[in-house]
Amino acid sequence: MSLTKEDIINAIAEMSVKDVVELISAMEEKFGVSAAAATVAVAAGPAAAVEEQTEFTVMLSSVGDKKVNVIKAVRELTGLGLKEAKDLVEAAPKAVKEGVSKADAEAAKAKLEEAGALVEVK
């Protein structure tokens, strides 16, 4: 008669912590694996993805009460005409610039915030 997974789990549940640690060590030796190495590799994955972001989007979240100043700032940043800039501002939340470097995104954010807008960089 062979043991089922449930039998093994029940047996482990009845063991002391010391015995479980010894069991894990024995399994690591027998199968040539390490539980700690797998945890480190998984934890490092998301951090690497965040560091790789090179393109950013400047989102106009809200215009505020200085709409004219925000329209002027949008025109300067994008080169849009008056009507297009006005339409973009009135459609907030909307992307003002996409695929720009971090420095350009931060500069655009500062300019729009100075004009009175609420801005987010993604």
UniProtKB/Swiss-Prot annotation:
This is Large ribosomal subunit protein bL12. GO terms for biological process: translation. GO terms for cellular component: cytosolic large ribosomal subunit. GO terms for molecular function: mRNA binding; structural constituent of ribosome. Keywords: Ribonucleoprotein, Ribosomal protein. HAMAP family: Ribosomal_bL12. Forms part of the ribosomal stalk which helps the ribosome interact with GTP-bound translation factors. Is thus essential for accurate translation. It holds the Pfam family Ribosomal_L12. SUPFAM superfamilies: ClpS-like, Ribosomal protein L7/12, oligomerisation (N-terminal) domain. Belongs to the bacterial ribosomal protein bL12 family. Homodimer. Part of the ribosomal stalk of the 50S ribosomal subunit. Forms a multimeric L10(L12)X complex, where L10 forms an elongated spine to which 2 to 4 L12 dimers bind in a sequential fashion. Binds GTP-bound translation factors. The keyword Flavoprotein does not apply.
